């Protein structure tokens, strides 16, 4: 049993990215699907598919690299952890690397990026930073 499934999700992506793997698989859940959709929309991954394995399912993530095999994802960092939750009000929504990266928040209106949260005028739990 995992104590922090989101940290495991980010670690699997980080490890596959560091090893230049084309794909990685993570156990499926609603929040992981939402995080993966944001990664796709923001251009950090090529795509993903949900694979039914007869249990909870898996998400197969297709990683993205540049022309000369440079990594598109430079870094991933878990911010709000089970032992220390981190929340941001609507005025405190963080900017990652001056807008070059994204912060992903869990808000009352669902999982969204820092830009979307600022546009909606809401805050929430800061899940992670990706740059």
From Swiss-Prot:
GO MF term list: rRNA binding; structural constituent of ribosome
Gene that encodes it: rpsH
InterPro entries: Ribosomal_uS8, Ribosomal_uS8_CS, Ribosomal_uS8_sf
Described purpose of this protein according to its UniProt entry: One of the primary rRNA binding proteins, it binds directly to 16S rRNA central domain where it helps coordinate assembly of the platform of the 30S subunit.
Family to which this protein belongs: Belongs to the universal ribosomal protein uS8 family.
NCBIfam families named in the record: PRK00136.1
Phylogenetic lineage: Bacteria, Bacillati, Bacillota, Clostridia, Thermoanaerobacterales
A GO cellular component entry from the record: ribonucleoprotein complex
Identification of the protein by name: Small ribosomal subunit protein uS8
Pfam families according to UniProt: Ribosomal_S8
GO biological process, one term: translation
Superkingdom assignment: Bacteria
Gene3D superfamilies: 3.30.1370.30, 3.30.1490.10
Presence of keyword Acetylation: no
Keyword presence, Ribosomal protein: yes
SUPFAM superfamilies in the record: Ribosomal protein S8
Subunit note: Part of the 30S ribosomal subunit. Contacts proteins S5 and S12.
């Amino acid at each position: 049993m995992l104590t922090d499934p989101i940290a495991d999700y980010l670690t699997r992506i980080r490890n596959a990215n560091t090893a230049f793997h084309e794909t990685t698989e993570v156990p499926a859940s609603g929040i992981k699907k939402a995080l993966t959709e944001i990664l796709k929309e923001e251009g950090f991954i090529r795509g993903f598919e949900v694979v039914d394995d007869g249990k909870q399912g898996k998400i197969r993530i297709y990683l993205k690299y540049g022309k000369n095999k440079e990594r598109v994802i430079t870094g991933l960092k878990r911010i709000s952890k089970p032992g220390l939750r981190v929340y941001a009000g609507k005025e405190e929504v963080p900017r990652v690397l001056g807008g070059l990266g994204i912060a992903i928040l869990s808000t009352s209106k669902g999982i969204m990026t820092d830009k979307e949260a600022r546009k909606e005028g809401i805050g929430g739990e800061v899940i992670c930073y990706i740059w």
